[in-house]
Amino acid sequence: MAAIKALQEWCRQQCEGYRDVSITNMTTSFRDGLAFCAILHRHRPDLINFSALRKENIYENNKLAFQVAEEQLGIPALLDAEDMVALKVPDRLSILTYVSQYYNYFHGRSPIGGMAGIKRPSSDSTEELSGKKGLSQPAKLPSPAQTQRSPLSPARTNPVVQRNEGGSQRPSPKAAPGTAGSSVSSICGVCGKHVHLVQRHLADGRLYHRSCFRCKQCSSTLHSGAYRATGEPGVFVCTHHSSEVTSVSPKSSNLASRKPGGVTADTRPFGVSWTVQEANGEGTPLRVRTAAWEHAGGNTTAKGFVQTELKPPSTSQVHVGSSAGPKLPTITVTTTSVTSKALTHVTNSSPIGWSSPAQSSPANFNSRPVVSPSARNTHLPGSQGQTASKGVKTQLNLNSESSNTAVTPAWTSSASKTQQAREKFFQTPPSAPAPASAPAPAPTSKVPTVVTVPTSKVPNVVTAPTSKVPTVVTVPTSKVPTVVSAPTSKVPTVVSAPTSKVPTVVNSTNSRVTTVVNAPTSKVPTVVSATNGRVPTVVTAHTGRVPAVMNTSASKVSPVVDAPAQESSREQALSVLRKALPALTGSGTQAPNRSFPATSSVLVTLPKNEVPQKVPSDKLSALTTQTPNFTIKLEPSAPVNVGNTAVFLQAGKKSPSISPRVGKTSVGSRPQAEVAGVKGPGPISQEGQEEGPEGWRARLKPVDKKTPAGRSLEQKEPVLAEPRIGDTSRKASSSSDSSVHITLTSIQHKRKPCPAGSGPSPAALSPSPSHRKKLAVPPSLDVSADWLQPEPKKQEDGTRSCKEEKSPTRWSRERSAVLDSGLAPPGEAVTSPVRLHPDYIPQEELQRQLQDIESQLDALELRGVELEKRLRAAEGDASEDSLMVDWFRLIHEKQLLLRLESELMYKSKDQRLEEQQLDLQGELRRLMDKPEGLKSPQDRQREQELLSQYVNTVNDRSDIVDFLDEDRLREQEEDQMLENMIQNLGLQRKKSKSFLSKIWSSKSKSGQA
């Protein structure tokens, strides 16, 4: 009896001096609840106003004590206020176990429930407590129809005993017939069986076996802080299902609720963090995360395809199918015509993020308007509602006569007029049927985006099989080859990116298919057209910039493509162009008789390790982004270097060549008349002495003369990735009289430190003709989109490499700097720096440890049930004291397991929150780096949303640290206190080893450093 006597003596000392409180035993002395309130008031007088309590208010006193202990101290309520009223003699073992938790807490030890309860915010203090004592109805269990209080934050705690009085009077149970020592509310809310003390789990006012308290969806045992209530009473679900922990990348992030109007799928896996959102995340944000994560918090990646169907001019549907799971809901967008202003948004998210330097480049397009069944292996990240800024948006305009799968028509008012002018320009002569009609042209500066499509890391072979099927354009942002073929399509497809300054045009009329592609960071337009005599070849320019012209065929990708052109077609197209673009024709920089040749071919040499007929366009376009400092001149068939590439250009007898210039960037040349309003005109073919290199050198316009504002705008343009291609050489030749020869030689391996402002050395820029191979280039290839790049700000650190000094600001570089990790080599997936941390625990390992704890708890409960039966049978015997010590030890072991489980859950949450924070930080920096004058209202709104999510994520992480610190203060002396108690009882027991979790120790040390 020593253990019980010792605990009883401790209670007597704590309650000494309090009115109406006398501790003479461990049963009836606690029935009125004043003893519990007295113990709490002695240690925490701020929590209870003891002077207002009355001895006769049994229900109110017990309810107040249980509620305060649970919500403020984290001590789970093993007792119920109704039981204390209904039973003349309360259950002795229950009171002993419950009071022992008071003892443990106020002696620096965690309560039996672990850490979860401490994190719970205080509940409403306006509950009606009066009117209970005078009622005489018998005790009864809470019914499912009872009004339930709104669920508590799952990221903070386990919901426990909480009843919403709602202003109504709930009858207080009076003494009911029953055996002494039994508990009225001891029936599990799921299985209906008796719940032993060691098995008790209270949630939302109902009692459960811990093993019965499982997720309705995945049937996993619900863990502290990782579940949430549903609308159905007594039903809970995981905020983060264990099956999704190992398969879903937290970067998908969680981020919740991207741009308004975006198509989002809410599956909510990241409940504990990033959403735990958290999204993660937190309901994700961690936004997304991704899939919001997630999903409400995270993002899932499913293999599927995007298919848009063109309905009669009323509605259009976007189907997002998944072969790995159920299809997402169909989104219907109402449209009125092929030039409708309705927008169809398909948002995307990538499990590896958009900042991967090895997978994206400024000239890449994630456009996959129509994908045939053969291309269904394309990855379609399933949608956290990621912001449209993370993907290249594409507008698609289709003729309504398409009978098969067609792209949804969606044009904004600012884009429709420009596109109509382009359609008119690209239509066949009057003798041939025009695929679409276009009203009067009207130039515009930018083309809005409508559809975003995901990043693909697998080969994409896209075909448009039969006639009247729109052209298929796929240009993934990965380094995987892409083959584009459109044999007999009669419907024009226009693809444009929102941030492009000038268009890159691909006109393929051999099959009467018109494709227009705008590169997002293109400065000089490139027109690639292939004609068979039915369509004119005309130079087109956006905002007055001068294009270079190359010809190829969209019907077939071959090493050499040649087709004759007709003079009448050229004249007709030029007349249309002059009407649509008066700034270009008015400047006098291009005459009808001097238009570029209509028949030419393109052949590009790719690295020797590439496979023919499959050209990764991101590598080609990425070559031009390394060193943007160069000047432009004209030489006949003269090879010169462009940044880190050597280029041969020949068009008839006029060949513009591009060579690097130290410390300068000439974005254009000035012939007899400069293009009005254009800061960076491209090279124009001129006759006479202007053809020589001397004439062009004399007319070079240094970049230093540009206004600071103009330079700043160009520098601010984001480049999503930094290409890495070494020892590649590209050469183009033609079988026609007028051809374009292109040789691209990378000098990436020559990267070395150099002083600020200096240019690349001649040795570093020399071409390497020994590594050249001839490969076909797809018609959608943009070989000159990034020849001209803005001059970056000079670096103060002179030891930086030339490439870093000349590259514009990149989100991936900023993020890498923040994460203290280098860029991944080509072809490798980008690993989050959080995962590289020495104390990072993979989700698989976390789940394994949680399963181990689950098994130990199950075994512990079996022991506890047997020990409880022995204790009840031995009440008053000499063996009771020994059994009670064993009982306290068992409760302590359970306490340690629950604490370890809680730490693992918080560890998982913190890791997801950290990844979510990094994602938010990268996107937020990119938006904040954008000049205020260029920010749209959506950008400003998105910036505020990200800022709010970022602050919430940081606060959540800070809360986790605070909670852990509070618990550690009590846990430090826990084992010693238990040993001291046993020794005071006169029992010689071997000290048990503590298996406290050490998963936070390394992180704490690194944080202090």
Swiss-Prot record:
It is a peripheral membrane protein. Residues 430-442 have a biased composition (Pro residues). Residues 144-171, 348-419 have a biased composition (Polar residues). Residues 841-880 form a coiled coil. Residues 261-393 are annotated as: Necessary and sufficient for interaction with actinins. Disulfide bonds: none annotated. Residues 1-107 form the Calponin-homology (CH) domain. Residues 1-260 are annotated as: Forms an intramolecular interaction with the C-terminal coiled coil domain keeping the protein in a closed conformation. Residues 833-980 form the bMERB domain. Exists in a closed and an open conformation due to interaction of the C-terminal coiled-coil domain with an N-terminal region including the calponin-homology (CH) and the LIM zinc-binding domain. The conformational change is regulated by RAB13 and RAB8A. Adopts its closed form upon interaction with RAB8A and interaction with RAB13 causes conformational change from closed to open. This is MICAL-like protein 2. It comes from Mus musculus (Mouse). The gene is Micall2.
